[in-house]
Amino acid sequence: MIAISVSAQTGRIGGKIIDKKTGEELIGVSVQIEGTSIGAATDFEGKFLINNVSAGTYNIVVSYISYKKKVLSGIEVKAKETAILNISLEEATKELNEIVIRGEVKKESANAVLIQQRNSVSVASGVSADLIKKTPDRTTADVIKRVSGASIQDNKFAVVRGLGDRYNMAFINGAPLASSESDRKAFSLDLIPAAVLDNMMIVKTATPDMPADFAGGFIQITTKDIPDEDQYTVGLSMGAHSLTTFKEGFSSQNASSTDWLGYDSKRGIPSGVMKTEEGRNATNSQLIDQTKLFDNNFKPTQESSIAPNVSFNMSGSKRFKSEHNEFGVLGAIAYSNNYRYTPFVVNEPPLSDEQRSMDFKTADYKTYNYSNYRRSVNLGGVLNLSMKLGKNNKFSFKNLYTQNGEDQTIKRDGIQYVNHAAPFVDQENKVFNDYLYQYQQSKMYTGQFTGEHFITASKIKVKYTLGYTAISRSLPDFKRLIYQADKQIGDTVYPRSIVQLNPDANAFTPNQTGRFSSQLQETSPSAKYEVSVPVKMFKKSEVKFGGFHQVRTRTFNARNFLFTYDNNNLDPSRYNVAGLQGPDSVFGASNIDSSLFFQRETTQGSDSYTASSRINAGFVMFDNKITNRFRMIWGARIEQFNQRVSSEAIGKKVDINKTVTDVLPSLNIIYELTENQNLRFSYSRTLSRPEFREFAPLAFYEVNYNSIIIGNDTLVRALIDNIDFKWEFFPSAAQTISINPFYKRFTNPVEMIVVPNPSFRNFSYQNASSAENIGVEIETRLLLIGLDKLAGTNIFKDMTLYGNLALINSQVNLTNSGAGLSKR
């Protein structure tokens, strides 16, 4: 045995071996300690593990038929630790000649990481587990901002290559994530704590084995896996926000005792409230009694001193091994509590064509100052199980549960320049003072069972994943209180009053005082399977075929309550007094009677719906290594998609049922210019489908937009043609420079449009005739050790410079909607 030092205690040597040219895992590679019979062979994932190695320093011999033998020197094994070797092997020019290459383990591991990127079938960027550990990132939404070409909207939705949530798709551990939003195709990435992630990749070009419903990025989230050795970790971090930490005056709703755990135990519609059908026929007396059942909780609470932001995580894993089999279990929990205050200003232009044509002094125009107070709590847990039977069979069962609670209070004040009458006010400029209270809670469970098998004789690989995701999102008691006063003239300010209390109110609208409650439930079982078969074609080839099936089922229910009055019994003198009262007392019990205020339920049939969709897909993909330098990955995917929405419009049932089948080809070409340069070309056709609410011809109030949104049953799915070029240069180990121009052509893209309304802003959806997205991404990763030679220091030896730049131009042609040409 060749060793520099040896002790009585033992460790392990493990890692993964891949083909240097293709990045493919190599099966059956011999890994031995030089001069001994101690060793192991790689399994069907290219992984190996040598147990019971005495602590010391060794030379490791790696050999495989038709590949150059490699000897790694200076491999240090420490007691009770695993030395990780990620190794690439190069094909021998003559199969029977032995060629020995000697290298150091540190360089070898760095090269293996870059080789995986260099030989990736698609253009992809990602974040590793090591980087995630070094950052203060709290959720997956924070992590994704570190990926080239990606950003986050509203602190939770992914934007990739300038394309929003509609054009991105998220998978976790190989299975799709259900949408967390009621009216859009989007997954709220802040639901998954960063502490439970192993890695995250964003694939930007399509291949036939990937779902077709994306054009920006295919987000692949992987939770923690079973490590090669037993591990137990605990992490705690604290942070400060300059506008909240240890500050007074933070506004929030009346919190429940469980808010700190991310769910509500207090808010919601009280027991005793009539069902919607009963409320529609209720008398004023019944409505008054019902209004008094609700808490008078319109006053924001104040905090004397806000605690720092805090994050905590803990994980543990255990591996059990017999002579031929392995079993592992990993558990992790993560918790975070975050406060944020955001002040901003909004200028809202006139809404109608008539108003926009007016002179500024006579047109409606609004300017608002916002104060947004937000507390967000995330709690998540992971339980992952894995089992390996022999070297050719592996099973895993991964589970993730998260719950998130977000308490948000928005205070808004400003001026509306008006030229038309409104109830109880004069035709002068108006000062607004509004309060919006929103507590949103979300719960998600997602589980994936995966099996992987390798048939030694034929070298066929089989992989399948059964997935299930369930999401619950509720808004138990969204409240809005709107005050309005005439503009101050000199030292005189007209009394404030509650704005627009409409005696004929029959729907929840953006400019009225009231409350709103909603509940969304969605489940999404799925199945994916694929078979990879080597074929004798060109220098080396493989054909992969398989299928994908997914069923989404959703229910959404909402109830609306508006404060109103009885026009025949209203006492104006009492109204003028009550209108001066603050949020704590304006809707107190003494003001709830027939001559003043009460709540009327204005829930419409269109405020609730049930929906489902079904995808059945199959694909075939060829991976041809035509020459040593030229590789082509090509094939096609067929998807049949059925979508159904059931709801109720005014006086009638609405039932939409549509089925579409698409054939979607793709081609990826990789040409190796030199040993350290690649040139890539990619073409693919993908698509984007309307979401449930978008193509249902219903009008509904959307809290997040504070607007009425109207669906459109004439919408069709959009087709997208994607073209990518990429030049990659790898100057040395752990360094890369890349330039990636891309172009996308959209046919019939679904766009949100403004529906003119003189009172408040409405939205709907329409297929534009076409759109284009063109841009370039530049990414660099450079070691700074060269600066030490210039400066005569050793300051930069462990420093790396990362940088990325994305220049993107998008243009949408809206001529078929009569809206002209719009650019963004």
Segments predicted by a language model, with ranges:
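Signature of Gram-negative outer-membrane beta-barrel scaffolds
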Residues: 404-406, 509-518, 530-674
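Short loop/turn motifs that connect adjacent beta-strands in outer-membrane beta-barrel proteins
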Residues: 226-231, 321-328, 392, 456-461, ...
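Short, acidic, small-residue-rich periplasmic hinge/interaction motif at the N-terminus
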Residues: 18-22, 29-34, 63-65, 78-133, ...
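Transmembrane beta-barrel wall of Gram-negative outer-membrane proteins
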Residues: 289, 293-410, 667
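Outer-membrane beta-barrel signature, preferentially recognizing the C-terminal barrel domain
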Residues: 426-450, 603-616, 687-746, 756-787
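Gram-negative outer-membrane beta-barrel transporters
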Residues: 742-745, 764-824
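Periplasmic N-terminal accessory/gating domains of Gram-negative outer-membrane beta-barrel systems
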Residues: 76, 105-159, 165, 174-192, ...
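Short, acidic Ser/Thr/Gly-rich low-complexity loop/linker segments typical of extracellular
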Residues: 36-47
